[in-house]
């Protein structure tokens, strides 16, 4: 007989430490692609002899970000037909399929196969992004939910920092190792799926009280649509940092893939610090929390692009950018 789940006074389930850990581990799956980020300059060198341009090399990071949009949309569709954990498993399979890029030959066809693997990774990553929050929102309630939401960003930032350091060290040996290194997190993914619980569903998504399916898009105001567009554009600028830092570090003569890994891990580490510090100053800037975050990112971005070959200013810009991003 299955053990009965303990519940609070409102009837909400009270899950233990293992489920909480699993829910937090979901966000780390989104950052697995950070293994590859520092290797961008190394990949560029590997494919330069066959005429692959810098723009095409940048697509190695850009394509996953683009496909992540479609992956996030796909989650909303699949939730109507299958369980949340099943969707998570599909997302993980797609994402770890991205490690196959490490097996691609250094030919023109091999490069396009590499990009195809990045399409799969992007879809998986995009599917994981909303699920990292929804598992916490669906499984936990009250103060525990708020606490886990805060920890989620910190855990993601710390894991991304670790992955970038490891990826940079692997890329020094071979760019292929950076891609294959993603598989190091497979045991954690298996543990995450095993410990997670399927959220209790009171009502099917998209169904109102009368049992009829509604159109969620009709409830979105023009102002909300405008915000979607504005923040979509801002996200494009954010990913410029992610996709070009490795190339910029090498172009400025600051170092190779390992140095790029350390610098980018600093950004994700600062994101984690910002996430942990946010509750301390939340609401203390007159509701302009998001504006302050964007301003910090803009300051950091400006310092980075104007730092030239000054490594100290590059690091300072990274700190500002990372804190704003977090």
Language-model features and meaning:
Residues 39-70:
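Extracellular/periplasmic helix-loop-helix junction of adjacent transmembrane segments
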Residues 70-109:
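Conserved MFS/SLC helix-loop-helix module at the cytosolic interface between two early adjacent transmembrane helices
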Residues 17-48, 241-246:
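Extracytoplasmic
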Residues 37, 223-271:
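Extracytoplasmic gate region of multi-pass secondary transporters
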Residues 59-77, 265-277:
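Central cavity-lining transmembrane alpha-helices of secondary-active solute carriers
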Residues 287-326:
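C-terminal transmembrane helical hairpin of 12-TM major facilitator-type secondary transporters
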Residues 111, 117-155:
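Cytoplasmic helix-loop-helix junction between adjacent transmembrane helices
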Residues 151-197:
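Helix-loop-helix hairpin linking two adjacent transmembrane segments in secondary transporters
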């Amino acid at each position: 007989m299955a053990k009965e789940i303990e519940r609070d006074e409102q009837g909400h389930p009270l899950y233990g430490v293992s489920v909480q850990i699993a829910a937090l581990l979901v966000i780390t799956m989104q950052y697995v692609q950070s293994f590859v980020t520092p290797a961008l300059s190394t990949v560029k060198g590997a494919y330069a002899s066959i005429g692959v341009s810098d723009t095409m090399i940048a697509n190695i990071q850009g394509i996953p970000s683009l496909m992540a949009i479609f992956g996030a949309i796909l989650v909303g569709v699949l939730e109507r037909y299958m369980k949340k954990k099943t969707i998570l498993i599909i997302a993980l399979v797609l994402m770890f399929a991205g490690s196959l890029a490490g097996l691609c030959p250094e030919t023109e066809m091999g490069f396009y196969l590499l990009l195809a693997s990045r399409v799969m990774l992007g879809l998986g990553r995009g599917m994981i992004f909303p699920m990292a929050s929804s598992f916490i929102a669906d499984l936990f309630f009250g103060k525990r939910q708020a606490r886990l939401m805060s920890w989620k960003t910190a855990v993601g930032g710390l894991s991304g920092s670790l992955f970038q350091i490891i990826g940079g060290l692997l890329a020094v040996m071979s760019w292929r190792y950076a891609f294959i290194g993603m598989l190091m997190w497979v045991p954690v993914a298996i543990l995450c799926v095993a410990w997670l619980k399927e959220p209790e569903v009171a009502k099917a998504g998209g169904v109102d009280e009368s049992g009829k399916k509604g159109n969620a898009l009709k409830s979105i105001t023009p102002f909300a649509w405008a915000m979607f567009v504005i923040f979509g554009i801002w996200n494009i600028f954010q990913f410029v940092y992610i996709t070009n830092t490795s190339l910029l570090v090498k172009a400025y003569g600051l170092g190779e893939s390992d140095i790029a890994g350390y610098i980018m891990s600093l950004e994700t580490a600062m994101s984690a610090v910002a996430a942990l510090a946010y509750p301390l100053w939340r609401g203390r800037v007159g509701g302009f929390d998001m504006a302050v975050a964007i301003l910090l990112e803009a300051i950091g971005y400006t310092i980075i692009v104007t730092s030239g070959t000054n490594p100290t200013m590059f690091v300072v810009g990274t700190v500002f950018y990372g804190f704003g991003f977090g």
